Amino acid sequence: MALLQWMLDHVQDEEKNCENLSIDDQHSLFGINRDWLSFLQLSKLEITHLKHVYKLVDNDRAHLMVHPSSDNVHAWSFLCKPDNVKVVILGQDPYPDGRGCGLAFGTVKECSIPESLKNIFKELERSVPNFSPPDNGCLNSWCSEGVLLLNSIFTVVHGLPMSHEAFGWQTLSYKIISKLSVEMDSLVFLLWGNHARKLSYLIDARKHLVLESAHPSPKVKSARMPFIGCNHFVRANLFLTEHGKDPINWNILNE
């Protein structure tokens, strides 16, 4: 009990010292779209924690190559607004080779397509009528359909996967997931791989559809929940239409 009381007092003391920032101030500081900041309603403590994360990232940028660029870290927030979200695809962290663009699994157009994304296209080609794999990994047009492509860790050092796992980005990503779960209705969450599946506790499965499978990476072999054959894209659209929402046009990547 004494430890619990100390922790509560410590949090309260820390909150008292936290800065109360307006949405515009948060936008300037974090580079996150204002609509998302208004939706999230970050607490003073969360803002303080995020400022610490940004300091750690900036320290690394001073002497290391960090992906994606500062301008693209929160591209997800500008390409898919909270009111438009219908499907959430959870990723881990950006590609450590510089192909990432601020969207989970997506790349900039000029880069080659990563193996995980090739497998995603393979599952789409297998299950979605008339889907043809595009010649690049840009997934921006999915965002306009209401697909939120969200990594749980937003930055990475070149060549070092998960290098920023301990920085505290989860303060933001977990808040996004839990807030969407609470505030929105009838969303589809696609959790691919152990890292994403561990976040299922943040989602209310009574009101949302949660689909899980192995990670799409060809390096992952899972007899119990293989990615190829999961039918997640078809099942997502069935759920959306059953709940009065327009299905995702997965084929828009080629339009």
From Swiss-Prot:
Domain of life: Viruses
PANTHER family: URACIL-DNA GLYCOSYLASE
Protein name from the UniProt record: Uracil-DNA glycosylase
Catalytic activity line of the entry: Hydrolyzes single-stranded DNA or mismatched double-stranded DNA and polynucleotides, releasing free uracil
Record keywords: DNA damage, DNA repair, Host nucleus, Hydrolase
Originating organism: Human herpesvirus 6A (strain Uganda-1102) (HHV-6 variant A)
Active site feature: D93 (proton acceptor)
Chain's gene name: U81
GO cellular component terms given for this protein: host cell nucleus
